[in-house]
């Protein structure tokens, strides 16, 4: 192949490499690990630790095996609430060993008929894996298409980054779901509480016009959040 004909391929390869690097949810680590020191209010020690995108690093000389261990997913969380669900999140804030590693994991417990309400993760793609029970998982694309699947034990569903989605227990027994993310802090935007429970509030007129409903309905919805 001539030098002239290979030039476009080199340019394309370079462009793809740059694009791939920009699509990574979290920055690539530049060290083996950076166990998080999660800053607390007035914590001068945390402020003195070396910083990296995410949380400050615990001094390597003080890192121990337990920093890379998390037992929280082994225990079911309380689902006795109006939605019938609860989440145990293992992210860089709750599981310091994940800091800078670009991954996190969680456990969703759903009572019969319980729902993990509509929400999105602005910084991560999500894998939904059902450990027990039967769960309807679904998301809506930017084109307004609704994609969903009823998952049984051992089955998995993927939700693209930023898409609004949910998990709903359609079985007659409690369900357990493991969720995995390609970000140490995926973030969560809950649709209901964001729109109707923000502080300060979104004006009723804006919401009523946006949803084409009476302001009384907006006030009713706000009373729920």
From Swiss-Prot:
Residues 1-25 form the signal peptide. Keywords: Apoplast, Disulfide bond, Glycoprotein, Manganese, Metal-binding, Secreted, Signal. GO terms for molecular function: manganese ion binding. It is found in: Secreted, Extracellular space, Apoplast. Its main location: secreted. CDD domains: cupin_OxOx (cd02241). Glycans are attached at residue 86. Disulfide bonds join 34-57. Residues 71-219 form the Cupin type-1 domain. One of its GO terms (cellular component) is apoplast. PANTHER family: GERMIN-LIKE PROTEIN SUBFAMILY 3 MEMBER 3. May play a role in plant defense. Probably has no oxalate oxidase activity even if the active site is conserved. This is Germin-like protein 3-8. It comes from Oryza sativa subsp. japonica (Rice).
């Amino acid at each position: 192949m001539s030098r002239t004909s290979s030039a476009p391929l080199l340019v394309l390869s370079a462009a793809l490499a740059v694009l791939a690097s920009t699509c990574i949810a979290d920055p690539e680590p530049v060290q083996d690990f950076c166990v998080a020191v999660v800053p607390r209010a007035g914590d001068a020690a945390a402020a003195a630790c070396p910083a990296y995108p995410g949380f400050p690093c615990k001094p390597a000389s003080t890192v121990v095996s337990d920093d890379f261990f998390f037992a929280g997913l082994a225990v079911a969380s309380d689902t006795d609430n109006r939605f019938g669900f609860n989440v145990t999140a293992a992210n860089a804030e709750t599981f310091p060993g994940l800091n800078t590693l670009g991954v996190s994991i969680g456990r969703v417990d759903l009572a019969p008929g319980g729902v993990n309400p509509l929400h999105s993760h602005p910084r991560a793609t999500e894998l939904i894996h059902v450990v027990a029970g039967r769960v309807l998982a679904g998301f809506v694309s930017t084109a307004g298409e609704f994609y969903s699947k009823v998952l049984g034990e051992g089955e998995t569903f993927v939700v693209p980054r930023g898409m609004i989605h949910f998990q709903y227990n359609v079985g007659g027994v409690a369900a357990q779901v493991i969720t995995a993310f390609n970000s140490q802090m995926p973030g969560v935007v809950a649709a209901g509480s964001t729109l109707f429970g923000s502080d300060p509030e979104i004006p009723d007129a804006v919401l009523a016009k946006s949803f084409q409903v009476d302001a009384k309905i907006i006030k009713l919805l706000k009373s729920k959040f």
